[in-house]
Amino acid sequence: MFLLYKYDIFWAFLIISSVIPILAFLISAVLAPINKGPEKLSSYESGIEPMGDAWLQFRIRYYMFALVFVVFDVETVFLYPWAMSFDVLGVPVFIEAFIFMLILIVGLVYAWRKGALEWS
């Protein structure tokens, strides 16, 4: 009970970091114009009037390529701290990272065989 003063800065930061986004959303909701005209309902294409049908369906290949990119981007995020602290952590963590890499390589081979990496 006597050591709770250590967490005062944490609670202050938590409250402030929660209140600021809520206030930003509330202020924008109050100040934003509500009128919906033809300009608001039209599609936006880099400031140019849309030509033809603005609703275009993307091929699933783009989504698969993005998904594979995200998976290996997350892999990099996990492997970087491991590589920086490899000398401190020792062999057991090396084995865990090796298993992690093995699982990701199996996933890469699976995506490759399914054709998720083929662009054409």
UniProtKB/Swiss-Prot annotation:
Record GO biological process: photosynthesis, light reaction
One Gene Ontology cellular component term attached to this UniProt record is: chloroplast thylakoid membrane
State the compartments where it is located: Plastid, Chloroplast thylakoid membrane
This entry's Enzyme Commission designation comes to 7.1.1.-
Q: Which domain of life is it from?
A: Eukaryota
Q: Which reaction does it catalyse?
A: a plastoquinone + NADH + (n+1) H(+)(in) = a plastoquinol + NAD(+) + n H(+)(out); a plastoquinone + NADPH + (n+1) H(+)(in) = a plastoquinol + NADP(+) + n H(+)(out)
| Sorted UniProt keywords | Chloroplast, Membrane, NAD, NADP, Plastid, Plastoquinone, Quinone, Thylakoid, Translocase, Transmembrane, Transmembrane helix, Transport
Q: Which InterPro entries match?
A: NAD(P)H_OxRDtase_bac/plastid (IPR023043), NADH_UbQ/plastoQ_OxRdtase_su3 (IPR000440), NDAH_ubi_oxred_su3_sf (IPR038430)
Molecular function via GO: NADH dehydrogenase (ubiquinone) activity; quinone binding
**Topology with respect to the bilayer:** Multi-pass membrane protein
Span-the-membrane segments of this chain are: 9-29, 64-84, 88-108
Question: Which coarse location class describes where this protein primarily resides?
Answer: plastid
EC class: translocase
Give any Pfam family that matches. Answer: Oxidored_q4
User: Its biological function?
Assistant: NDH shuttles electrons from NAD(P)H:plastoquinone, via FMN and iron-sulfur (Fe-S) centers, to quinones in the photosynthetic chain and possibly in a chloroplast respiratory chain. The immediate electron acceptor for the enzyme in this species is believed to be plastoquinone. Couples the redox reaction to proton translocation, and thus conserves the redox energy in a proton gradient.
Question: Subunit details for this protein?
Answer: NDH is composed of at least 16 different subunits, 5 of which are encoded in the nucleus.
Q: Which family would the database say this protein is a member of?
A: Belongs to the complex I subunit 3 family.
Q: Per its record, how is this protein called by name?
A: NAD(P)H-quinone oxidoreductase subunit 3, chloroplastic
Gene name on record? Answer: ndhC
